Amino acid sequence: MEIRPLLMCFALCVVYATSKPTEKKERIHHDAPLSSREHDDAQGFDYDHDAFLGQKEAKSFDDLSPEESKRRLGVIVEKIDGDSDGFVTEVELRAWIKKAQKKYIYENVDRQWKDFDVNNDGMISWEEYRNVTYGTYLDDPEPDDGYNYQHMMARDERRFKMADQNRDQIANKEEFTAFLHPEEYDHMKDIVVLETMEDIDKNGDGFIDLNEYIGDMYNHEDEMEEPDWVATEREQFSEFRDKNKDGKMDREETMDWILPSDYDHAEAEAKHLVYESDSNKDGKLSKEEILNKYDLFVGSQATDFGEALVRHDEF
């Protein structure tokens, strides 16, 4: 069974506390790049292969005949068409690509699911999660390990409620994924910021000052010389993090720090696919248009090929 969200946080804190004091703690969340290659279709579709297949799976895709791959691409187009109107929009393409990006996250959730779905009803209630995660700890009101499990449980419950969009205290697979990986969901960003500020804001004033900011990432020891990157982070705080120059970061500034608005590679790829394939320029793609541009789409992760194109039982 894997370590749970706040228990994981405490475990990481222990590791950090015992690590070398010059090691930097990273809190910034970035989307993983679609590929390490340059995106240059004039030179081939290597970027698209890596981005949508994954580098390991790309070779298995090469084993399929063009005819079979094209047939399976047609099946996948129907999956991308979320509203089943016979067309694939840019929004649907972006959603599919983002889902492919999160494949490793869904696999992680699948591994944990059976641990929490105690009654095997295909859902996970807050009670199930609480009992599995905290049951043994709550039996001892005064544990000798120094952790406040009541506080940890309260924070987990708050996050669970935020992920539970229909407010029924029961999580389906997508809601549980948002609970375990809140940084991946727009509606969970506020809770990520709140939890981060609670962790770093030691004086409880609702802000993160320079000392708290540095103290979170650098474990100073008296006789150790401060590493160069700490001075760089002090400058980063003053010049870029603290936008209104009041000497501290509020929630908005903290969000800009830990959840930066990076370039949306999935959106750019979706726009690229539509632009290259939309022969009648109506802003959406028919199945025929996609299959006519077979080479482009086979080389794009809009198909999550690593699994979808070589998994025979789904076709």
From Swiss-Prot:
A motif (Prevents secretion from ER) lies at residues 312-315. It is found in: Endoplasmic reticulum membrane; Golgi apparatus; Secreted; Melanosome. Gene3D superfamilies: EF-hand (1.10.238.10). Ca(2+) 6 binds at D278, N280, D282, K284, E289. Keywords: Calcium, Endoplasmic reticulum, Glycoprotein, Golgi apparatus, Membrane, Metal-binding, Repeat, Sarcoplasmic reticulum, Secreted, Signal. Belongs to the CREC family. This is Calumenin-A. It comes from Salmo salar.
